[in-house]
């Protein structure tokens, strides 16, 4: 009788059940947050996808799509895990563990993919510079798309080129092929403008007067945009994985006691 009572107590340990319920509630809430965060990433609020797409390093967004699936799956499976813990059924716990392991692997792939491609773009300003010089003002679909992107960034962020206006002077470019340096050494949108979008002093800008020319580069803004996407996908994803692992280990222990 005593051994049977002990087995029953072991099987229905309120501490283990409580830990599983609490852990899975946090996972399901985190899954919803990850889902919302990665939907925001795929919406591309900074509108820099063309910049990453032309380099073939747009897998930050591929990682986001995987994370959308994983975020929703974390919510569903963690909700199931709460029920499995409360029901104390081996078959339900085993199903929960198998499903969670599959999601865990996919989320690992999402985090690693996003971070590695982010590192390739952000740690290499020369790549962004090369793209800008190659495609800005180029007469192609990619050229027109990249030209619109750079025009918008330079206007909104009040910047010029990747590192500064001298990018357009020190290197050959598609822009230079269409606009000689004596006509305009850098794109006219590098000029400071009034509230009515009129250049403050176009001639002063053309001559490089610092009061009429944007002197900072745009790479800081581009890097910040890519970092923002990566933090949402990779680092938050890694945080969820770090929490999920001990919850899964507790679930494995709980399974052995049933």
Swiss-Prot record:
Highest taxon of source: Eukaryota
Pfam families membership: Tetraspanin
Cellular component GO terms held in the UniProt record: apical plasma membrane urothelial plaque; endoplasmic reticulum; membrane; plasma membrane; protein-containing complex
Keywords: Disulfide bond, Glycoprotein, Membrane, Transmembrane, Transmembrane helix
Main subcellular location of this protein, as a coarse class: membrane
CDD domains: uroplakin_I_like_LEL
Keyword Membrane attributed: yes
Extracellular side: 36-59, 113-230
GO terms of biological process kind: epithelial cell differentiation
Membrane topology, Cytoplasmic segments: 1-14, 87-91, 253-258
Tissue expression summary: Bladder epithelium.
GO molecular function: structural molecule activity
Name of the protein: Uroplakin-1a
């Amino acid at each position: 009788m005593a051994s049977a009572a002990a087995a029953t107590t072991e099987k229905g340990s309120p501490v283990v059940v409580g830990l599983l319920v609490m852990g899975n509630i946090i996972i399901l809430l985190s899954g919803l947050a990850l889902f919302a965060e990665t939907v925001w990433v795929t919406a591309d609020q900074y509108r820099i996808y063309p910049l990453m797409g032309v380099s073939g390093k747009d897998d930050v967004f591929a990682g986001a799509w995987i994370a959308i699936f994983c975020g929703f799956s974390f919510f569903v499976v963690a909700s199931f895990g709460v029920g499995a813990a409360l029901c104390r059924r081996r078959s339900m716990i085993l199903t929960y563990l198998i499903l969670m392991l599959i999601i865990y692997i996919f989320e690992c792939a999402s985090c690693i993919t996003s971070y590695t491609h982010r590192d390739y773009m952000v740690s290499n300003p020369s790549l962004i510079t090369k793209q800008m010089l190659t495609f800005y003002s180029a007469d192609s679909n990619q050229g027109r798309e990249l030209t619109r992107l750079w025009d918008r960034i330079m206007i909104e962020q009040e910047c010029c080129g990747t590192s500064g206006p001298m990018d357009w002077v020190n290197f050959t470019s598609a822009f230079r092929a269409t606009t000689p340096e004596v006509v305009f050494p850098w794109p006219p949108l590098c000029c400071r403008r009034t509230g009515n979008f009129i250049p403050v002093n176009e001639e002063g800008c053309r001559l490089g007067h610092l009061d009429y020319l944007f002197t900072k580069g745009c790479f800081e803004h581009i890097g910040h945009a890519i970092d923002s996407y990566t933090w949402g996908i990779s680092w938050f994803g890694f945080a969820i994985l770090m929490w999920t692992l001990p919850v899964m280990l507790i679930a494995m222990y709980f399974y052995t006691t049933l």
